[in-house]
């Protein structure tokens, strides 16, 4: 199906009970569903002859700490045959376990591991759900908005112990806010010169 409007109608008619909302923007179709329907909707998008979304481009998360359902899951699919993209989303609570797409798209394996590592979202039936980007024993999930800028621990090589060690972060000074006016900005004589030029014109 080459037309996004036709594709939107097709998906809404075929998956009536599984679609919460659809919208076309930026030449892409956005589909909002519930977590429970991710497997059925993904299978339809991949196998239906009029959709053929046979490539999973990415799995990622948006963190909204102020929301009751903190995380929004985002899946990006591509149909090479029809040159179309679909963005599939649903919201979940902080400690909710969600279905893995590895049985449908093996490429989801590392993408879901990255989401687990960076945000702490767990996937049911994932074949190897462990950290992929951070070090062994890493504390926390770095892309959550409540993760401290300095991290929880510092990993460094100790000359004394001749090995890599991990220890709590020690800040030598309190956090300082360097948001102040530069001496090169807003000087009085420049402001006066601009005002004088405005009066002349």
Regions found by a protein language model. Give the residues of each.
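Terminal low-complexity/charged segments
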Residues: 1-201
């Amino acid at each position: 199906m080459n037309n996004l409007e036709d594709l939107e109608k097709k998906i809404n008619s075929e998956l009536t009970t599984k679609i919460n909302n659809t919208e076309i923007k930026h030449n892409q179709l956005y589909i909002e569903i519930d977590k429970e329907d991710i497997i059925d909707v993904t299978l339809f998008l991949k196998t239906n002859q009029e959709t053929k979304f046979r490539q999973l481009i990415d799995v990622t998360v948006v963190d909204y700490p102020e929301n009751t359902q903190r995380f929004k899951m985002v899946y990006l699919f591509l149909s090479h045959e029809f040159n179309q993209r679909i963005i599939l989303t649903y919201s979940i609570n902080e400690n909710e376990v969600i279905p893995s797409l590895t049985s449908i798209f093996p490429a989801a394996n590392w993408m879901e591991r990255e989401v687990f590592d960076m945000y702490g979202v767990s996937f049911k039936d994932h074949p190897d759900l462990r950290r992929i980007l951070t070090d062994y024993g890493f504390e926390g999930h770095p892309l959550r908005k409540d993760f401290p800028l300095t991290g929880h621990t510092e990993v460094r090589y100790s000359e004394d112990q001749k090995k890599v060690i991990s220890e709590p972060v020690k800040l030598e000074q309190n956090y300082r806010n360097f948001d102040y006016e530069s001496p090169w900005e807003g000087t009085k004589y420049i402001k006066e010169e601009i005002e004088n030029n405005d009066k002349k014109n």
